[in-house]
């Protein structure tokens, strides 16, 4: 959406509307569960920013699977949000995610902001830890090309490629018949 409005009722309830690109006003609940969850997260962070303006404490927020029910593009934008809040307000986030889009976005931001080559001047705010079933957790360090120095376990990054290869094999099999 382009904008939003909140209408309060005697401090007990509220209506939350989202103004879409066409100028239509929609209830947030009609936008889907993912949008609702993302907006609640954003409003909570905004509240903490307001509260923290006076205290100026270093805050670390734990966020569990914020990508649930979100369109891939919004998952990516959520990573932008975490990055901007970190940059502007110094909040740190520990995010548990299974989202390839969010992880890939950290790689892109790290390259765009030159976090990888100039660690002394411009430290990388992103740290990726992969929890491997057999090997246990390990850090996925960024290389200068924006890739990771280690692989994720099977079924994470390679799943899309694996399915594509299976489709190609199936198409070739069907064409041979």
Language-model segments: residues:
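ABC-family P-loop ATPase nucleotide-binding domains
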Residues: 1-7
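Switch/communication elements of ASCE P-loop NTPase nucleotide-binding domains
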Residues: 7-165
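Conserved helicase/translocase motor-coupling segment
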Residues: 172-177
């Amino acid at each position: 959406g382009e904008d939003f409005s909140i209408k309060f009722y005697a401090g007990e309830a509220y209506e939350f509307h989202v103004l879409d690109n066409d100028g239509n006003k929609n209830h947030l609940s009609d936008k889907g569960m993912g949008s609702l969850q993302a907006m609640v997260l954003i409003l909570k962070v905004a509240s903490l920013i307001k509260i923290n303006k006076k205290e100026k404490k270093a805050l670390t927020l734990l966020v569990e699977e914020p990508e649930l029910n979100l369109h891939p593009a919004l998952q990516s934008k959520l990573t932008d949000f975490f990055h901007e809040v970190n940059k502007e307000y110094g909040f740190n986030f520990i995010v548990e995610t299974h989202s390839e889009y969010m992880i890939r976005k950290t790689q892109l931001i790290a390259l765009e902001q030159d976090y990888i080559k100039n660690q002394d001047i411009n430290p990388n705010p992103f740290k990726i830890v992969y929890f491997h079933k057999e090997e246990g957790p390990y850090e996925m360090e960024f290389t200068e090309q924006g890739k990771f120095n280690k692989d994720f376990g099977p079924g994470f990054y390679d799943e899309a490629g694996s399915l594509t290869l299976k489709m190609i094999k199936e198409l070739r099999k069907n064409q041979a018949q």
